Swiss-Prot record:
<dbReference type="GO" id="GO:0009436">
    <property type="term" value="P:glyoxylate catabolic process"/>
</dbReference>
<dbReference type="GO" id="GO:0004474">
    <property type="term" value="F:malate synthase activity"/>
</dbReference>
<dbReference type="GO" id="GO:0006097">
    <property type="term" value="P:glyoxylate cycle"/>
</dbReference>
<comment type="similarity">
    <text>Belongs to the malate synthase family. GlcB subfamily.</text>
</comment>
<dbReference type="InterPro" id="IPR001465">
    <property type="entry name" value="Malate_synthase_TIM"/>
</dbReference>
<comment type="subunit">
    <text>Monomer.</text>
</comment>
<dbReference type="GO" id="GO:0006099">
    <property type="term" value="P:tricarboxylic acid cycle"/>
</dbReference>
<feature type="modified residue" description="Cysteine sulfenic acid (-SOH)">
    <location>
        <position position="620"/>
    </location>
</feature>
<dbReference type="Pfam" id="PF01274">
    <property type="entry name" value="MS_TIM-barrel"/>
</dbReference>
<feature type="binding site">
    <location>
        <position position="340"/>
    </location>
    <ligand>
        <name>glyoxylate</name>
    </ligand>
</feature>
<protein>
    <recommendedName>
        <fullName>Malate synthase G</fullName>
        <ecNumber>2.3.3.9</ecNumber>
    </recommendedName>
</protein>
<dbReference type="Pfam" id="PF20656">
    <property type="entry name" value="MS_N"/>
</dbReference>
<dbReference type="InterPro" id="IPR048355">
    <property type="entry name" value="MS_C"/>
</dbReference>
<feature type="binding site">
    <location>
        <position position="544"/>
    </location>
    <ligand>
        <name>acetyl-CoA</name>
    </ligand>
</feature>
<feature type="binding site">
    <location>
        <begin position="125"/>
        <end position="126"/>
    </location>
    <ligand>
        <name>acetyl-CoA</name>
    </ligand>
</feature>
<dbReference type="Pfam" id="PF20658">
    <property type="entry name" value="MSG_insertion"/>
</dbReference>
<feature type="binding site">
    <location>
        <position position="118"/>
    </location>
    <ligand>
        <name>acetyl-CoA</name>
    </ligand>
</feature>
Length: 727
């Protein structure tokens, strides 16, 4: 039984109450009585509005379902369908031209294009690693991944392989030629880097002394001018540091003594309370809130054990250099942090209202994460030496919003939280995830509702695909999952997001972002493909690891995103008609083998993720697929897989017994993939009593009934069931 404290009309879990009063509030200038009185008022007045918005979602979905049932068996009349969506208020008029007015935004958002990490906040080690991933070793990223082939004697091996190391060095030199080319010759032939007055001079193997083709790209150094230990370059707004130490193991093999090239990598990071975590009660939430508080105070630390050794990981300080003019140059040593709150759907038992109902978790997150973030403001006396924002802003990503009314509710909520905390109006900035269909088709109207708060729009094609399937659940059978990325709507959706963001004046004020690279081990493929994101005009895109951030950073050196955006302005490429094209399968005559393959692939993915969510409380996992390729799975990928199978079940492509058979076939596969985990409990053969297996089955068989196809209601209930059974 949860111990609670009565505060006004609220019943607050004691673990949360104590955290807020004893840890989060001290140093903010807000006393406990003021905070809780304000929180009580916000929850009491806004929770009914939250419920009304969810009811509207259900009402619109019911009308869409009925329209498709009424038109079953006939090809969809695109014009009639669009008119219907307008008639019911799903598709709204585009607002008159406007530009956002967001102010006091850090340069990492306004003028620096680069990678963005997304990290589960419940894991302190991951959170620290991500915060410190502002800078990363290019040599390590290349050597330790498949970015460099292991062919021709270049295997990673257990010790240092000079053949592989030389390939890494050659790749890095080619990168330097692209990012900061020489006036003549190549960095590959460099034998010495020195500073002559205020100019970088490079000696080549043939004795030639040259300079940078664009001398202004040299911005700082460390060490003596005639023997620098670091050369700091700036290209497309991102820094790259050539580190020199001829006595080091790597530097001793390099003609110029270069031991590494360190890149500014994860410029921004989202600390996630949503899809990558499993937080179902007050205890879970407080773990995340405490980590978020520690990041903002600058005192989060974690004891790391590697074999017999252990060390304490903390946040990195700022990086100091000598500028070209001889003054001190200080660069931020940590990623600029956003926090992703949950959406509007779920409630959480951490606080009960006057009627004993769980309060909306999104309201809870807004109140508590904002309180913690006050400590990260450089204008606040609450922060430690390591502040987050230097412009006085708190950056909150708000996911899974459906249309402009819901964005308006978020901005109202943020305004109310500012009043509780005594913060200036518009301190709380919002990142709008464009991952629900009603937000996509009304994106300009959504942005307008946050015209003075928006700092970010981002396509989340995973969740967006889940909503695409669920919205048109009754329309017919959808294409197979692997075919979804080839459908007309998805390309239009990606272009529409950039086009709309630019038309609304986001350039120079906010990020226009793209989604996650999920194949964590396939970095060579990422290097080849993910450059498409900056080329599409996105000034940030998601990566799954610090290493991925460093490699993706090279793309922003090769592509001037702001120049790309300039070329795209005023040239809309996408239409709402294309976005409204439902990805129905043109034919459903799949063979039995094809159906089995689709079932097995999706069931294996679902089980692999759900078993760790339910049993271990892990919300983001590297889950091997049926071919043992590691994929980063979170609730968004689960939503697609479960909704696709629910759709096929609804339209008779597969039967309930087919689904159950596939789950029972795949459970031993997942068990085998987890056999190295001593804590893991097998699902097979006792399927009926295994909570995780039953949750996976429910997600598919009941998928058509789930609100917007979301997985949270079933996952939360089943996780609490597991925790109670194993208390």
């Amino acid at each position: 039984m949860t111990e609670r404290v009565q505060v006004g009309s609220l019943q607050v879990a004691k673990v949360l109450y104590d955290f807020v009063v004893e840890e989060a509030l001290p140093g903010t200038g807000v006393d406990a009585e003021t905070f809780w009185a304000g929180a009580d008022k916000v929850i009491t007045e806004l929770a009914p509005k939250n419920r009304d918005l969810l009811a509207k979602r259900d009402d619109l979905q019911a009308q869409i379902d009925q329209w498709h049932r009424d038109h079953a068996g006939a090809p969809i009349d695109a014009a009639a369908y669009k008119a219907f969506l307008q008639e019911i208020g799903y598709l709204l008029p585009t607002p008159a031209e406007f530009s956002v007015t967001t102010a006091n935004v850090d340069t990492e958002i306004t003028s620096t294009a680069g990678p963005q990490l997304v990290v589960p906040i419940l894991n302190a080690r991951f959170a620290l690693n991500a915060s410190n991933a502002r800078w990363g070793s290019l040599y390590d990223a290349l050597y330790g991944t498949n970015a460099i082939s292991e062919e021709n004697g270049a295997e990673k091996g257990s010790g240092y392989n000079k053949v592989r190391g030389d390939k890494v060095i050659a790749w890095a030199r080619e990168f330097l030629d692209a990012a900061a080319p020489l006036a003549s010759g190549s960095h590959a032939d460099s034998t010495k880097y020195v500073i002559d007055g205020s100019e970088l001079k490079i000696t080549l193997a043939d004795g030639t002394v040259t300079t940078l083709a664009q001398p202004e790209k040299f911005v700082g150094y460390l060490g003596a001018k005639d023997a620098p230990t670091s050369i700091l370059l700036l290209n497309n707004g991102l820094h790259a540091e050539i580190q020199i130490d001829a006595s080091s193991p790597i530097g001793s093999t390099d003609a110029a003594g270069v031991k590494d090239v360190v890149l500014e990598s994860a410029v921004t990071t989202i600390m996630d309370f949503e899809d990558s975590v499993a937080a179902v009660d007050a205890d879970d939430k407080v773990v995340g809130y405490r980590n978020w508080l520690g990041l903002n105070r600058g005192d989060l630390s974690e004891e790391i054990k590697k074999g017999a050794k252990s060390f304490t990981r903390t946040l990195n300080g700022d990086r100091k250099y000598t500028a070209v003019d001889g003054s001190e140059l200080s660069l931020h040593g940590r990623s600029l942090l956003f926090v992703r709150n949950v959406g509007h759907l779920m409630t959480n038992p951490a606080i009960l209202d006057a009627d004993g109902n769980e309060v909306p978790e999104g309201i809870l997150d807004a109140l508590i994460t904002s309180t913690c973030a006050v400590h990260g403001l450089s204008i606040s006396d609450a922060n430690g030496p390591l502040d987050n924002s230097r412009t006085g802003s708190i950056y909150i990503v708000k996911p899974k919003q459906h249309g402009p009314e819901e964005v308006a509710f978020t901005t109202e909520l943020f305004g109310r939280v500012e009043q509780v905390l005594g913060l200036p109006e518009n301190t709380l900035k919002v990142g709008i995830m464009d991952e629900e269909r009603r937000t996509t088709v009304n994106l300009a109207a959504c942005i307008k509702e946050a015209v003075d708060r928006v700092v970010f729009i981002n396509t989340g094609f995973l969740d967006r695909t889940g909503d695409e399937i669920h919205t048109s659940m009754e329309a017919g059978a959808m294409v197979r999952k692997a075919e979804m990325k080839k459908q007309k709507w998805i390309g239009a959706y990606e272009d529409w997001n950039v086009d709309t963001g630019l038309a609304c004046g986001l350039q120079g004020k906010a990020q226009i972002g793209k989604g996650m690279w999920a194949m964590t081990e396939l970095m060579a493929d990422m290097l080849e493909q993910k450059i498409g994101h900056p080329k599409a005009g996105a000034n940030t895109a998601w990566v799954p690891s610090p290493t991925g951030a460093t490699l993706h950073a090279t793309h922003y050196h090769r592509v001037d995103v702001f120049a790309v955006q300039d070329s795209l302005k005023g040239k809309p490429r996408a239409s709402v008609d294309d976005i409204l094209t439902i990805p129905l399968a043109p034919s459903t005559d799949w063979t039995d083998a094809e159906k089995k393959e689709e079932l097995d692939n999706n069931c294996q993915s679902i089980l692999g993720y759900v078993v760790r969510w339910i049993d271990a409380g892990v919300g983001c996992s590297k889950v091997p697929d049926i071919h043992d390729v590691a994929l980063m799975e979170d609730r968004a990928t689960l939503r697609i897989s479960s909704q696709l199978l629910a759709n096929w079940l609804r339209h008779g492509i597969v039967s309930e017994s087919d689904v159950v058979s596939a789950l029972e076939r795949m459970a031993p596969v997942v068990d085998r993939q987890n056999e190295g985990d001593a804590e893991y409990r097998n699902m097979a053969p006792d399927f009926d009593s295994n909570i995780a297996f039953q949750a996976a089955k429910e997600l598919i068989l009941e998928g058509a009934k789930q609100p917007s196809g979301y997985t949270e209601p079933i996952l939360h209930r089943r996780r609490r069931e597991y925790k109670a059974a194993n208390a």
